[in-house]
A protein has these predicted regions:
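C-terminal motif of bacterial Sec signal peptides marking the signal peptidase cleavage site
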Residues: 20-22
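A flexible loop/linker signature enriched in serine peptidases of the S9 family
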Residues: 70-72, 90-100, 115-120, 135-163, ...
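Blade-level signature of beta-propeller repeat domains, shared across WD40, Kelch, NHL, RCC1
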Residues: 344-383
Length: 383
């Protein structure tokens, strides 16, 4: 546990203003014909929202970078199936709790989806793009839930008042999907739109579950003691990827169970895992002792993009990385001295959206950025 202490302190600094549920989901790209060309190709989608922003010269995979948000705290932005909109969580500049909004990439128009009360997290479009799923605490109280007790060190709150809700993309027809004791959040949908995956404490630990889109046929697919979260499906729906922390027996396990009983977890290290969609054939992808989170499949289904502080000895700087599903071929994607996280590819594989502290309006300000994705920067440069 001691070897993770510097990273924990850094994690609290970098992410204190961002709800770190890190759903890491989204409607996946077409598995049969992913766009992996050397240079960005023309697309029917026109991004008129936001303002151009210069990428670091070392960020060769990213071109035509645009900053989409500018005030408040903005993160966990995920594409609609047609790639024209995002759904994300935002804390207004004037304060309050995170709420869920949609964002039109052509115009920048935003629409509140959640109730404006309680705290929300982890939003995701239904396949047809007219409904959104998210987690919210508003049924228990319209007030923001109490922040976690930091006297115990840096901890995350897994509020038992979080349940899954569905609403139209304009906030209408709000429907509660789960109503079980404990935390239900971090839901994403399969590319086929037939099942969803989420994290729940309904059986006493933070495990992954799948269920039909109407809330029926719930299946628990992980059972190892520890935190399993932020899962999503591969492009063909056959695999899942998630981040997890499995405490070792002894004091670390005792601390985990004690905090869990208080609705808290201590995010020491987080590693990335993959498995079949039913939870079988689990394989560990990263093994570096750092905080690795927000994994999302590359359009090919053969690589994973994720955020990590592995290259900063102080643990303060998080960047995006690409890695093969077997753990080989690690490549760094972003190079800023600030936080970069929550990456997601667009359904056609041509764009990457993520959250970043670059160009902040105030210290630690997190905003949403989008860029065209270049699969092979060296080849594109020679064109």
């Amino acid at each position: 546990m001691d070897r993770f202490t510097p990273r924990l302190s850094a994690l609290s600094t970098a992410l204190l203003t961002v709800a770190f549920a890190a759903c890491g989901g989204g409607d996946a790209p077409d598995a049969e014909s992913p766009d992996t060309s050397d240079a960005p190709s023309s697309s029917a989608m026109t991004i008129g929202a936001g303002e151009p922003f210069a990428a670091d010269a070392r960020e060769g995979h990213l071109v035509n970078l645009r900053q989409l948000t500018f005030e408040g705290e903005n993160a966990e932005a995920y594409f609609s199936n047609d790639g024209t909109r995002l759904v994300y969580q935002r804390t207004p500049a004037e304060g309050g709790c995170d709420q869920i909004f949609t964002f039109d990439l052509a115009t920048g128009e935003q629409q509140l989806v959640s109730t404006g009360t309680g705290r929300t997290t982890c939003s995701y479009f239904y396949p047809e793009g007219e409904r959104v799923i998210f987690a919210s605490t508003h049924a228990e109280s319209e007030m923001c839930p109490a922040p976690p007790d930091m006297s115990q060190g840096y901890v995350w709150a897994v509020y038992p008042s979080y349940d899954l809700w569905i609403a139209d993309d304009d906030g209408g027809n709000l429907t509660q999907l789960t109503d079980t004791p404990g935390y239900d959040a971090e839901a994403t949908l399969s590319p086929q739109g037939d099942r969803m995956i989420f994290t729940s404490t309904r059986d006493g630990d933070l495990d992954l579950y799948t269920m039909a889109l109407d809330g029926s046929d719930v299946r628990r697919i992980t059972d190892r003691v520890g935190y399993d979260g932020g899962a999503f499906y591969s492009p063909d729906g056959s695999k899942i990827v998630w981040r997890a922390h499995y405490p070792e027996e002894g004091p670390e396990m005792d601390d985990y169970l004690r905090l869990l009983g208080q609705g808290l977890i201590r995010p020491s290290s987080l590693e990335v895992y993959v498995a079949d969609a039913d939870g079988s054939n689990v394989q560990q992808v990263t093994d570096n002792g750092a905080a690795n989170f927000g994994p999302f499949f590359h359009p090919s289904g053969e690589k994973i993009i994720f955020s990590s502080n592995m290259d900063d000895p102080t643990g303060r700087n998080f960047d995006l990385y690409l890695i093969n599903v077997d753990g080989t071929g690690l490549e760094r994607i972003t190079y800023t001295d600030d936080f970069d996280g929550f990456p997601m590819f667009s359904p056609d594989g041509r764009y990457l959206v993520w959250g970043s502290n670059r160009n902040p309006s105030h210290d630690g300000n997190t905003n949403v950025f989008i860029a065209e994705w270049v699969e092979n920067p060296a080849s594109a440069a020679g064109m």
